[in-house]
Amino acid sequence: MIRSSIRPTVILPGYFAGATPYAALEQFLNQQGIPTVTVPLTRSDWFPTLGGQPVTPILKKLAATIDRHSPAGERINLIGHSAGGWIGRIYLGDQPYPDSSIGAAKIWQGRDRVSTLLSLGTPHLSQERWTKRNINFVNDTYPGAFYPDVRYVCIAGRSIYGDRGWRKGWTANLAYNSYDLTCGQGASWGDGITPVEAAHLKGAINLTLEGVVHSPGSAQSWYGSETIVAQWQSYL
């Protein structure tokens, strides 16, 4: 096990999400004695990434947050929800990643700052043409649990079966379409957005949690609900 003590933790929100929906998760982890902050994103921070553009603006805010939260260079634990998980994999990397703001590329080398990357409902696969640009870069350059000195923990939710047809209801239809765009198989189990198959990585510690939905704000439990956090917080 890589962890020898409780480390600072940083939460990276999912695509097009700000920090606010993660406030309860951040507070709960702090109450558990895990010093935690969320990358201070707003929805507008994501605008430059639309259409499959590089996620450089998000990586910059992630790097700045880690530097502030662990100024002495101590390795932290990184929680990436949804797209935050594969963006975290880019941050770990030691190969050039395009920087749209300067028309060049940057090596983030975040593996030196991260002890555990814990992804929550992250689609580590995609068939969607815009998302594929970034995810293909990640999977081609850093396949699976790529760095042996980083612990990868991938959490999938299993609550909604993808099915289509007006009799199935909008939740099952939405899940079917999302799963199909993600892994090419709509008739799958997942969290309503990410199918189980796509949320796991080869070589990682892969867990599947029953009854968990993708996003905060639902009447059902999501990855950051207190009873669910209790099932994965030991990896921090």
Language-model region placement:
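Lipid deacylating catalytic domains
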Residues: I2-L236
